[in-house]
Structures are given as C-alpha cells and as structure tokens.
C-alpha cells in the first residue's frame, strides 16, 4: 500500500483513483504482491462473433492469449485476452486505452480486467 500511496502523492493527485488504480489498491489490500507477475485477464465485448474474432487477431499480435466465446448474458461475444505480467499502473492504463480504442473502432466495449491474488 505504501507504494500506491507514494505514487498518488507524488503525482499531486487529489482526485479519485481511476479504474486501474482502484483494482491495484484492492489487490494490495487483499494481500497480493504487486511486484510479482500476475495472470491478468482483460474483457472486451463485441456484437458478433466475426467482429470478436477480428479483435482477437489484433490482440494476439500484441502477445496476448485470446479466447472468443458467446457472452454469458445477452447477444454479445466475449473476447478475453490473458497475459502474465507485473501489474504496473502505467502498463494497465496503456492497455485500457489501446483495448478501449480497438473496441470502439469495432462497435464493442472494453470492460476492464481481473486477476487472482498472488502472494
């Protein structure tokens, strides 16, 4: 938690943490060692299987393991992208921007990421 507090105070930040910061804070509170690699899964939703497969191809080119399947609810398709990496705020924010732009370009939605706690 000290590292996250330092990052927030060094940036002069008094604003509410963004989505990625919030998840990192929750992981740290749960006892996760943020200096170790985590198996992080990112979630994108698309209106059709063809579009989800198109996104998956682009994401695979960036070194992610990707699976496409019908979403559990609704008529959308889930594109889940997994990568083992140290969860660093700047890297996660860049992925969010990149995946958000990709999803927007294909009429989809980027829905965040998750990872198990790593001790």
Regions found by a protein language model. Give the residues of each.
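Sec-dependent bacterial lipoprotein signal peptides
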Residues: 1-11
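Long, contiguous binding/interaction regions
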Residues: 13-119
């Amino acid at each position: 938690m000290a590292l996250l507090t330092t990052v927030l105070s060094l940036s002069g930040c008094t604003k509410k943490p963004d989505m990625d910061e919030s998840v990192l804070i929750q992981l740290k509170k749960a006892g996760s060692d943020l200096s170790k690699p985590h198996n992080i899964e990112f979630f994108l939703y698309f209106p059709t299987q063809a579009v989800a497969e198109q996104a998956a191809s682009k994401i695979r080119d960036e070194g992610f393991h990707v699976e496409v399947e019908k979403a559990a609810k609704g008529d959308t398709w889930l594109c889940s992208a997994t990568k083992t990496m140290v969860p660093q705020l700047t890297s996660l924010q860049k992925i969010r921007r990149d995946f958000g732009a990709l999803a927007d370009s294909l009429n989809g939605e980027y829905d965040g990421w998750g990872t198990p706690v790593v001790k």
